[in-house]
Amino acid sequence: RRVYIIGLSMGGMATFDLVIRFPETFAAAIPICGSVNPTRLSAAKDVHFRIFHGDADKSVPVEGSREAYKALKAAGADVEYIEFAGCTHNSWNPAFNYPDFMKWLFKQRSH
């Protein structure tokens, strides 16, 4: 199955939440400048993740994405974390322009 979810800011939070609630639905998730309670993420360990965040984000602290990455890694998930130096809350701009953004996404399939 190849169902993908991408969200930014509050949508990034919803991306994490939906994948935790319905992990069997999604092949891949790209939360951008989102956050989540990392203790919930083991439920999503079979979903491919690519997490983006700016290290200067004052709206959604970057620590949320850092902790999500650590929790997913600890659960054995296929996860990549990309942090943009000096980027504020609009990290979706460099994320959507990341060199292989769509190529990576469309390669993902459910386990």
Name these PLM-found stretches.
Residues 9-13, 34-38, 55-59, 86-91:
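Solvent-exposed loop/turn segments at secondary-structure junctions
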Residues 1-45:
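Primarily recognizes the serine-hydrolase "nucleophile elbow" in alpha/beta-hydrolase
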